[in-house]
Amino acid sequence: MLPCVRGAVQRTEGFVIPHFSFLIQMKYFIIAGEASGDLHGSRLIAELKRRDLEAQFRFFGGDLMAQSAGVEPIVHYRNMAFMGFVNVLLNIDKIFHIRRLAEQNLLDFLPDKVILIDYPGFNLRFAKFVKHNLPSAEVDYYIAPKLWAWKEYRLKAIKRYVDRMFTIFPFETEWFGSRGYNVEYVGNPSVDSVSAFMNEDFDEVQFRAENGLDSRPIVALLAGSRRQEIRSCLPIMVQLAENYLDYQFVIAAAPGVEAEFYESLVGQTRVKIIYGATYPLLRVARAAVVNSGTATLETALFRVPQVVVYKVFGGRLAMLLKPLLIKTPWVSLVNIIAGREVVTELLAHNYTLERTKTELDKIIEDGEVRQGMLQAYDEIIDVLGDVGADARCAEKIYKG
């Protein structure tokens, strides 16, 4: 089958036969293994459908992708979130079962294009399977694995099994290019998400009333999207609230994590939990304590001063090994994009109640640290560029 490109031609026995994209019903097989991938995948599907009304989709993902595609996921990302060596080992049978499902569906569906969204541990192995068993399919990767931070050895697999890579951070173009692999920066989808939300009508008074919040300033608590990291990070965040009686501490619950799970960690404290409203919460927050991940960048795009935290197993040993495992001096996207420390990172044994309170005190009230952070946020926003990441990526994938 010819790629979906307007004006493509095929030469057969002296005749030139034109082929046009609207004559070809394209099939897209997409894998997104996390909540963030579900969001980006849903927008990518919507943009592809705008360009290709007859497109067919089969995917591993979540509810948002299901809404965009009009079909249910083969496997929901909730059943694919395994963090850490021990957790992977305990669920190895389930992981192999999911991998077999992906392989079987690929060969049953026979897609024209395979789109992999982040989730490199699973996706790079799947890319290898695709190239060995369905070489006619184009393998596109949206949101490059963070090889500049760790596991650079994966670049070998990318060069071999991934046809095109679309990145969401400007510096990745140079990083990959200097290692002999050309990638395309399409913009950052978080810029799209936050910009779209900020352009919507929003009633802060109504938001507070609907969620049982009074007029006191709010500290947002973003503890991550996976149960394991939430369980590790949230207890200290909850304890922190007892030191700030003039503020409301509010947890932004992750999609796909049950209310009972959060309630078991919060107990009888005065910390509130809201569901499906992370962006509204950040829009009204005075400050935030954020588990390292995409949420740190989203918090910066909302111009909310933050303390970044991350609890890892191993404590001091983990921090001693960090330079050997992670090639960047920082873990938060805010600092990595800025190329300097903009937000304080409290990692492993440094993430304590006392140290978190010390850092939060510096940004919760107006002062030099808070203003400096907000200024740095503006610089980061300029570097990331304009909205339209998902649309640009979809256009490139569609045209082939």
What feature does the model see in each segment?
Residues 3, 23-400:
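Nucleotide-activated sugar donor-binding and catalytic core shared by glycosyltransferases
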Residues 5-7:
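Glycine-biased, low-complexity coil/linker segments
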